[in-house]
Swiss-Prot record:
This is Imidazole glycerol phosphate synthase subunit HisF. Pathway: Amino-acid biosynthesis; L-histidine biosynthesis; L-histidine from 5-phospho-alpha-D-ribose 1-diphosphate: step 5/9. It is found in: Cytoplasm. Disulfide bonds: none annotated. The active site is at D11, D130. The keyword Membrane does not apply. It comes from Escherichia coli O1:K1 / APEC. GO terms for molecular function: imidazoleglycerol-phosphate synthase activity; lyase activity. It is an enzyme of class 4 (lyase). Keywords: Amino-acid biosynthesis, Cytoplasm, Histidine biosynthesis, Lyase. GO terms for biological process: L-histidine biosynthetic process. The gene is hisF. Pfam families: His_biosynth.
Amino acid sequence: MLAKRIIPCLDVRDGQVVKGVQFRNHEIIGDIVPLAKRYAEEGADELVFYDITASSDGRVVDKSWVSRVAEVIDIPFCVAGGIKSLEDAAKILSFGADKISINSPALADPTLITRLADRFGVQCIVVGIDTWYDAETGKYHVNQYTGDESRTRVTQWETLDWVEEVQKRGAGEIVLNMMNQDGVRNGYDLEQLKKVREVCHVPLIASGGAGTMEHFLEAFRDADVDGALAASVFHKQIINIGELKAYLATQGVEIRIC
């Protein structure tokens, strides 16, 4: 059995790490490189960086900080933000990123997933999915351009259908960003994760809702996700990564202990 992964998420805007609630009202957390170094030292298995306004601004992720991060950490990291071409991806990988993640650009041009996978290998192609639960219809819908409130829109894709589609096109991993739960720290959407797990045959990463160590345990134990991504509980030092891993190990979760 592969070890489960603990993944701090760093949302980046204007060269700073920020954090919002349900993708809104972002506050500045701090500088990118020191935070990345801290999480690596605490025992994170990998890091994910989202340049949250790159796609909505029509630009690619700011590459200036990518190489600086690569210089100070020795764990894998993934970068996302406005990657719309093979050239964009090649540059980011050349600066030291281990994976690239696409979200809104994949919705705009699903063939991008296949082209990236063919060029760089499925192992480094992650598809992020921003999913919103509509209580009126009881359905999960994929959203696009979520980094800019004025441009955010609901797509025609239902989440489960899009999960299946991106796998067919070559996604090597899926990060499910559950927007309803984002930043509120009341637990991952286990019901949605279980439904996605049934149709997801590549590594699945849960994102949105972690508030306690038990929430991580539930995601691993009840929804069988491969990794759990979180931001605010780590940024605000509510949960220490080393202590979280020790707790999960006592609960029988296969986890890498530093």
